[in-house]
Amino acid sequence: MATTEWTTQKPGGSTQQPGGQEPLASEDYVVKTMPPILGTVDMTATYVLVILFITNVPTAVPGGAATFTYWILGAITFFIPCVIATAQLGSMFPHEGSLYNWTHKAFGGYWSFFAAFVAWFPSVLLIISTGDLLVGFFQGLNSNWLVEPWQQGIVVIAVSILSGLVAIQRFRMVQNMVNLAAGFMLLGILLLGLAGIVWLVTGHPSATSFSHLSDWTINFDPKTGNLGLFGVIGLAYLGTEIPLRMGGEIVGRQVITRHLLWGTLIVLIGYLMSTFSVLVVQGQNADYTLFSVVNTVDMALGKIVGSIVVISLMSF
């Protein structure tokens, strides 16, 4: 992997970017004022939380066995190329801001601002949607909970306030919370994957057919086709560059490639394993709600383990 910086030395010791651009102030300021505390585990945990959204699984399973085809096709055509590009750019320019910094070097200030804004803005909306997901969990536990819109609104507001309070804590404390949340989420996904295996081992039939080639193929029919799943899969794989927005705070350049390698493997295995269990236990007609993954565990491993999965996913 190349690690050469695209800068030239000017008289007096300052550096200059190709085309006469001066380096961004953040390239020097961040490394001088913020401690390099992010290691491979920290960056991998952030990477996994950003990309491995278990909510994408119930949305993808209507494709049946073809969902695996789309997961693999999306990984080959989009996800892995993004990972390779992120590793290359991150190694060449290991600076704070990632996408903004890289776009600034290639296209200048206008387009770097545009790229950074459209990458940042969905994060604001994501805080709201996370509160809505929490509401979905509570309603899955008891259909009589949070039935009124104002009750749901209070939960969303509470999650937003809690997010703000967490954001003003010491960075190391926040990162430890991120690592813990990633661990809980992986525990939930591991139990979900185990549910599919136990379901088959205990003699239950698979709710989805995997035995015919037609089950795995892409269907282009406008009315009954599954081509739209490719968009769902592409959305699920977004975000490879997000952890490197903190690129000026990593302990060394080896963290860049290591967290991308391990994080990518965890994401791929997590999505495939979760999809397998939902398809085997509930089939492609599983409902589109997040709680369908919990129902999968309830059916195969019992309510107690299902409750553990609920707590694990709610921590995310």
Predicted regions: what they are:
Residues 1-73, 79-86, 211-217, 249:
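Membrane-interface "cap" regions at the ends of multi-pass membrane proteins
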Residues 35-47, 69, 108-121, 155-156, ...:
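Select transmembrane alpha-helical segments in multipass membrane proteins
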Residues 58-60, 88, 100, 104-105, ...:
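Helix-loop junctions at the membrane interface of multi-pass solute transporters
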Residues 61-63, 80-160, 164-165, 307-315:
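Hydrophobic transmembrane alpha-helices that form the core helical bundles
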Residues 67, 71-72, 180-184, 243-279:
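Junctions where cytoplasmic loops transition into the N-terminal start of transmembrane alpha-helices
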Residues 78-82, 192, 266-274:
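Alpha-helical transmembrane segments of multipass membrane proteins
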Residues 101-102, 108, 140-145, 261-316:
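TM-loop-TM module centered on a large, flexible mid-protein loop between adjacent transmembrane helices
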Residues 138, 151-208, 260-265:
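Membrane-interface loop-to-helix entry segments
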